[in-house]
Amino acid sequence: MNLHTPKWAIKTIVPEEVYTDRQYFLDSFYEAALKARTRRTMSTVLLGQRRMGKTEIFKRVVNRLFFEQDHRDPDAVVPIYYSFPENVTDKWHFATKYVENFMRWYAAFRLRDTQLLSAETYERHKLIELISNHRGLSETFKTTPNLLKTILEQDVTLPEERAVWLPRRISDYDDSTIVVFLDEFQNTRLPQYHFDVVGYMQEAVESPTCPHFVTGSAMSILAREILGRGSLFGRFDSEPIEALTGYFGTELTSKVAKYYQVTLTEEIAPVVAERCGGNPFYITAIIRQAAKQKQALIDESTLNAMLAVDLSSGFIWNELSDQVNRWIERINDYGITKWILYLSALEEGDEIDIKRIQQQLKERDGQEVSIETIKEVLIKLSRGDLIDYKSFGGWFGKINDPILVDFLKVWGKIEVERQDRGMVRDDLRQEYTNLKLKISDLKGYLAEIYMAQILLNAQRQSLPGKYFHQENDIQVPYFTYVRLRERLGPGKDSEMDVHGGAGAEQWVAESKWRAGRKAGPKEIKILLDKAEIVRKDRNADIVRVWFFGHEGFTVEAKTLMKEQGVFWSTREDLDGLLDHVKLRRLPKL
């Protein structure tokens, strides 16, 4: 190998010092790729909202497959990576690019030479000559230059079909194993360019010798239109990826702050993660903005200030405005798409009132627009994950992304209402500066995040009873969900710090972290009342009640908890649990 050849086949973006909590997906796709040698791996989609780290996962798995196998082993799994572009000149250009990309990846792996992946370093004619003459490549693979030549000469029927079938043809004929990683898979169908290869993909993805792992940035198009119907329906297993949990969002926040040398208090880190909805991109953007402004993040007020700046003119603004404007350009049939998207974001509730939007269009823009036209535009917006469309119920709602919704309000004032950009940004900073603090007990909230992650890590396992002051070990169920700060009724005492739902078994947990103050019987009784609310609301057979008191408990509280079967943990107990499930201990504040 050339000494200057990098130790990666495809460059990743996130620094190792920062990368957080995607190990499950890295291992899952790596192991599934290796398992393809046994012909037991199904084509799989990694499905999730934008900016959740899907592309990074694919790149890291590809690099691992590239370097951690013996490339000379005929049973080695050959990784191929391709990202579908947003615009396609014609079918000939696509077929040429797809076939050449496959040739480069296959040859680069088999010869362990990453320089073959670069068209700038290794020109096409040199690649063709190498493949045609190298003794270390299979005779079947050596025929690929012939296909490339016929495509370049436009002397082949259905070039796009021949292109996407090529990896399977090689693996089937050689009885070898190839795994194809396809990013931006929603771009297999681009109506505005009269480009659609979805139908041809069916034959390609069904081969046990050549499973395809796909992902993309438009979740709705992928799930509903490309994989959820038509020729590819039922051909893919699904691996959903969600936002980071509170614990790992907190960990990422701390890592990014250290990387960018931003002062960050332990207490505010989980609040940054929560306000960003656990989205890695948003978290990183806020920390980078703080670094740019030389602003320490020490409380909610400083966090709000950074959110206001970044939403209106920073990294988040640049990313989301590009995303929104590109999608609107793609679908703008009526000249009213921007207005409808903006007015949808202004709706007070989560559900969008179409009649109100119709009325607002008339009042604000003087346009008479039918309900059917508005629905049609909303459906198109939902395809770009800008609106949530419940097709079975026939109603629309805001997307579950509070940062995006807040951005759309600012974007609409500037881009749609044409208000003064500087004034809008200044108003947003004022609004965010005056926001009421959402979390009064920052230390208690931090502990809740750790408690929730303990439950998630311990699913289907037992935890030592001693850490709950119980004689027997505690069996933890598989949870449908574990939520923080969930409210199941009116009044302040109906909010659960931690609520885990596991069908007939429910968990309710409380956290108290107040310096010099032990938890007493009153707090225990309030928690027991909350548990009863959960029992009735969820019709539960079993409700596990768990109380964390950082400063400990009064004698009376311990007596009551023993009588009522309440699990309880001190700081030392919680640290013991964190050690047991291999998480870092609570920070010392």
Please place each PLM-identified region on the residue numbering.
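Walker A/P-loop-proximal flanking segment of P-loop NTPase domains
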Residues: 1-72
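P-loop NTPase nucleotide-binding core
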Residues: 42-43, 48-182, 188, 194, ...
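Sensor-1/coupling segment of RecA-like P-loop NTPase cores
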Residues: 172-182, 187-193, 200-229, 241
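Helix-loop-helix "sensor" segment of P-loop NTPases
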Residues: 224-274
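Winged-helix-like regulatory helical subdomains adjacent to P-loop NTPase cores
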Residues: 284-371
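Short, amphipathic alpha-helical interaction segments positioned at domain boundaries
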Residues: 319-320, 402-435
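Short amphipathic alpha-helical interaction segments
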Residues: 364-385
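Catalytic cores of nucleic-acid endonucleases
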Residues: 491-493, 501-507, 511-573, 577-578
